[in-house]
């Protein structure tokens, strides 16, 4: 396994773009979709489905840590270990915020009620992340540990059907 990229940021929404930038670039290392706009090489391009899934799931979990574990208070930190390989991306987030019971998150009822245009409350971010990832685990702490894993889709082998 490759050496992880390590980053520690304050556990607030203000620092989310910093963490997202690093995660997006790590995803691009795995997907090999590093498209650079010659006019602005710093523009974040996450059009590749792998990159989009990783960034979307990561943002949901980061939001949960900042909003729920740290209760929107300053002072907490989020430690990231991001490990890109040629087949997958593994992201570990550690925080010392308030733990919670992941197993207690009820599955969402996504049946449409055409008379109600509101989104379900509670668990939406967890549902989104689980849907986007191949694996997601959570171990309450301290420290709390999230482990997110996204694998590249299998590529067909030449000469096989």
Protein language model annotation of sequence segments:
Residues 144-153:
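Short C-terminal beta-strand
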Residues 75-83:
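A conserved short beta-strand within the histidine kinase catalytic ATPase domain
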Residues 81, 87-92, 147:
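Short, highly conserved beta-strand within the GHKL-type HATPase_c fold
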Residues 69-74, 140:
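A short, flexible helix-to-loop-to-beta junction within the catalytic ATP-binding CA
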Residues 128-144:
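Conserved glycine-/histidine-rich ATP-lid loop and adjacent helix of the Bergerat-fold HATPase_c
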Residues 21, 27-59, 63, 118-120:
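Conserved short strand/loop->alpha-helix "switch" segment adjacent to the catalytic nucleotide/phosphoryl-transfer site
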Residues 116-133:
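Glycine-rich phosphate-binding loop
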Residues 91-121:
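Glycine-rich/acidic phosphate-handling loop/turn and adjacent ATP-lid/helix
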């Amino acid at each position: 396994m490759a050496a992880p990229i390590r980053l520690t940021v304050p556990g607030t929404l203000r620092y989310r773009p910093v963490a997202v930038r690093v995660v997006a670039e790590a995803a691009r290392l795995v997907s090999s979709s590093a498209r650079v706009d010659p006019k602005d090489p710093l523009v974040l391009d996450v059009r590749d489905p792998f990159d989009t899934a990783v960034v979307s799931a990561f943002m949901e979990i980061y939001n949960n840590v900042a909003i729920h574990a740290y209760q929107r208070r300053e002072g907490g930190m989020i430690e990231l270990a991001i490990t890109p390989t040629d087949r997958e991306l593994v992201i570990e987030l550690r925080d010392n915020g308030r733990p919670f019971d992941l197993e207690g998150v009820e599955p969402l009822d996504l049946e449409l009620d055409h008379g109600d245009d509101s989104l379900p409350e509670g668990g939406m971010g967890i549902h989104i992340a689980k849907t986007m990832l191949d694996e997601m685990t959570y171990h309450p702490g301290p420290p709390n540990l999230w482990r997110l894993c996204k694998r590249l889709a299998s590529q067909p082998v030449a000469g096989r059907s």
